[in-house]
Amino acid sequence: MSGISLSSYRRVTVKIGSALLVDRAAGLKREWLAALVDDIARLMSAGTEVLVVSSGAIALGRTVLGLGKRTLRLEESQAAAAVGQIALAGAWSGELGRHGLISGQVLVTLGDTEERRRYLNARATISTLLKMKAVPVINENDTVATSEIRYGDNDRLAARVATMMGGDLLILLSDVDGLYTAPPERDPAAKFIPVVDAITPEIMAMGGAAASELSRGGMRTKLDAGRIATAAGTAMIIASGKERGPLSAIERGARATLFKPSPTPVRAYKTWIAGQLEPAGRIGIDDGALRALLQGKSLLPAGVRRVEGVFSRGDTVAIVDSAGREIGRGLVAYDAADAVKIAGLKTGDIAGILGYEARAAMVHRDDLVLSGPTGELMDRKVEGIDVAGA
């Protein structure tokens, strides 16, 4: 793959994996970080805005605290994160300061990108940092996040940040140098894929486990991140960060996989809906409702066959077809209890069941994003309708 001019992008989000930044015995890899910051400073001097999503708080904290390799309890992980976050923020501040740059730490939880009001507030804060020429250094707030309310990996967090901020490139740096047809450590015949035009089910199937002990992510989470990013019009690169100056290495043509952005990205409001990581519930629809959605119509109760989960009006729900495949997400107009009551009913019968005059649509088309497992419309046909071309 020929070199990519990173300075040709307007706003770049760089995600750094824990294993790149932290050595279990020695702690923070300061020389590696210094070389990366040199790259960042060079990009910024060329006019490119840079956001950093930095893993490593727990890994660094457990090294500082001498917690070893054993599996940590939740409270131990959170304590390690508390120690690691301070050390990590100080390291970023010091290295960026060598170039006269200011860093701003932003710690987020799942709710900061999944709840609309907090999403807008987080976006405004980071936008202000960028306007002030500061470098946002973003991480999940592992001191308060629990397994039930967390991203679970910084790949998807980075994709949410990149799309939230309208970035045009996301770079995932880790200990893998791109996408292969199979995990190369297990299959010597695995072939490297330099460019991905669209994240199809076949591409998703290539996502084997590629996580190291110090990181939580693997190739599957990187492909999940790619679905979020590319659907919103953000290109993505998966590259190895093992070499010092990894961004310069990408520009020199080091092995990396480029995921092209969708040619028809969804607008900002729908980007937020489509990128929701944890839908509150699922609504199963019949083929007639699917045809209507593909024609740009709203989802009416008559086409709903099942309702799963506990959700409130305004929550994001996944919409699945008769085979159980997710074909879209949207903001539901009813809470779960009422949705169950009116599933399958004609619009004129709803008021008699609920006892009040209600909305005609279960999910209005303005609050709906069609997206298959690939982040694009599904490549299949439903009774003569070409979903891929709809």
Swiss-Prot record:
Its main location: cytoplasm. It holds the Pfam family AA_kinase. The keyword Amino-acid biosynthesis applies. Residues 280-357 form the PUA domain. Catalyzes the transfer of a phosphate group to glutamate to form L-glutamate 5-phosphate. One of its GO terms (cellular component) is cytosol. InterPro entries: AceGlu_kinase-like_sf, Asp/Glu/Uridylate_kinase, G5K_ProB, Glu/AcGlu_kinase, Glu_5kinase, Glu_5kinase/COase_Synthase, Glutamate_5-kinase_CS, PUA. The keyword Endoplasmic reticulum does not apply. It catalyses: L-glutamate + ATP = L-glutamyl 5-phosphate + ADP. Disulfide bonds: none annotated. It is found in: Cytoplasm. PROSITE patterns: GLUTAMATE_5_KINASE, PUA. HAMAP family: ProB (MF_00456). It comes from Chelativorans sp. (strain BNC1). Substrate binds at residues 55, 142, 154. Belongs to the glutamate 5-kinase family. The gene is proB. CDD domains: AAK_G5K_ProB, PUA_G5K. One of its GO terms (biological process) is L-proline biosynthetic process. This is Glutamate 5-kinase. One of its GO terms (molecular function) is RNA binding.
